[in-house]
Amino acid sequence: MANSSVYADVIVVGAGPVGLFVACELALHDVSVIVLERDADSDNVWKKGLLGGRGMYKPALEAFYRRGLLADLLYDEKRVTYLEKTSGFQYAGHFGGRLLNANAVDFSRFKYHLPGPTFLPAKTTIADIECELSKRATECGVRIVRGVEISRVEDEGDEVTVWADNQSFKSNWLVACDGGKSTIRKAAGFQFTGTDSELTCYIAVCDVDKPELLGKGMKPTDAGMYIVSGPRHLYVMDFDTTFDRSQTVTKEHLERVLQRVSGTSVKIEALELVSTFTDRCKQTTQYRKGRILLAGDSAHIHSPLGAQGLTTGIADAFNLGWKLASTVKGYASADLLDTYQRERQPEGAWTLDWSRSQVVIMRPDPAGKAISRLVTEYMATDDGTTFFVNKIWGISRRYDLVGAQAHPLVGCSVPDFQFEDGSYLGSKLHEGKFMTVDFSGSKLLEEATDLVQPWVGYLSCSVKDRLGMNALLLRPDGVVAWVAEDEVKVDSWKAALSQWIVLPGEA
């Protein structure tokens, strides 16, 4: 017999980076949260060091930065805020193993991409992210329950019940962040569609007899690609999907694959760790079904080519957290939660297409090689490099905000304006509120903002370059919802705000 139910406003399933970020966002807004995690221990070799290494691009960096977590996560209080170009090569990313030179990027094309702590990508590990987010979640009162296996979930219309081991948990909402094989997604009947794999990929910690034959870095070949990322760390991507991934990868099998893909006679002398993955690309057709929502790999899976997975998942969490909190607290506009799917599903679909297109240029057939030559030629130009780096880094990502003001900055992440004292706007957004940013010195917006406290903050400041703007309204995730370039009109500001929350007297 099950024990009496444990209740929270929201249940989050999965204590990885996405689930923990959602939990922290909810708790920031005084929403009670329980996180249920299958693994009893967060310590895992695949989350640490080179094996756990992940790239983070602008959307994810901004999420951590705007909640005061970036410096601790990167162990870097004085992060480089701009790219100093050199005469040689500076790595900016890759597309299907074809490298991009940051020195060829024309950053002048990105008016709103200002120097600051999120200007450049960064590297971290899953272990470090989980450590920092777990600390923040605990400080905010989130309860994390580890070592529980979910057996059933039921959306009962006005609440959700989750059964895990000999315990039931009830909440008003459930957010599934439990990975690509999501138990919740399957149990709740979400459709998950897309394309099957063309590649079988191996990641290994091993010793080889002649490492000089392999070299270092990314190596596209006529049979796929391999990557030597460290003295003993190896990735091999093979256009052969006949291997049964439920079987153990032996040293002999991996050696045969490595020799075929690399075109060398290198031998594996010792195999310490090995795992496999594929390039399957699938996405749920709905991000919300009743009171159950999906985020991160629960909503979309793809190969790790281009290192977009972590950024896409954290961006899901950042977009969803404040919207769900507003809904729980009762001040959300009627369709606020619908905007989560409206904004994030296209981003997930783009990530899948970005992954698929890289596989295409890696194909060993004549068509794949022809496309590869064409893409590589374009990437070698300044225009091509600028295009690819913009896409990979997420510099000019923009949400199409229905009914919003027609301005090129509306729907974009707010520029990281630098104040006269040297600080940046991103460091002023830690409370996760809507924010009126006023460069005009007018009292009108301050008085209007006072009427909608505590949901909206007000910041009057002098910045080094206001980019022709007098005032802005920011969502809690830092997305621009309204801009005043000339006269500041309070009615226009109020109309923009009312698209997201119910203003006092309008309920």
From Swiss-Prot:
Induction: Expression correlates with the formation of the sclerotia and thus the pigment production. It is an enzyme of class 1 (oxidoreductase). Gene3D superfamilies: 3.30.70.2450, 3.40.30.120, FAD/NAD(P)-binding domain. It comes from Claviceps purpurea (strain 20.1) (Ergot fungus). This is Monoogygenase CPUR_05431. Pfam families: FAD_binding_3, Rng_hyd_C. Its cofactor is FAD. GO terms for molecular function: FAD binding; oxidoreductase activity, acting on paired donors, with incorporation or reduction of molecular oxygen, NAD(P)H as one donor, and incorporation of one atom of oxygen. InterPro entries: FAD-bd, FAD/NAD-bd_sf, RIFMO-like. Pathway: Pigment biosynthesis. Monoogygenase; part of the ergochrome gene cluster responsible for the typical purple-black color of the ergot sclerotia. The ergochrome gene cluster produces several ergot pigments including the yellow ergochrome secalonic acid and its derivatives, as well as the red anthraquinones endocrocin and clavorubin. The pathway begins with the synthesis of atrochrysone thioester by the polyketide synthase (PKS) CPUR_05437. The atrochrysone carboxyl ACP thioesterase CPUR_05436 then breaks the thioester bond and releases the atrochrysone carboxylic acid from CPUR_05437. The keyword Oxidoreductase applies. Belongs to the PheA/TfdB FAD monooxygenase family. It comes from the Eukaryota. Keywords: FAD, Flavoprotein, Monooxygenase, NADP, Oxidoreductase. Its EC number is 1.1.1.-. PANTHER family: BINDING MONOOXYGENASE, PUTATIVE (JCVI)-RELATED, TRK SYSTEM POTASSIUM UPTAKE PROTEIN.
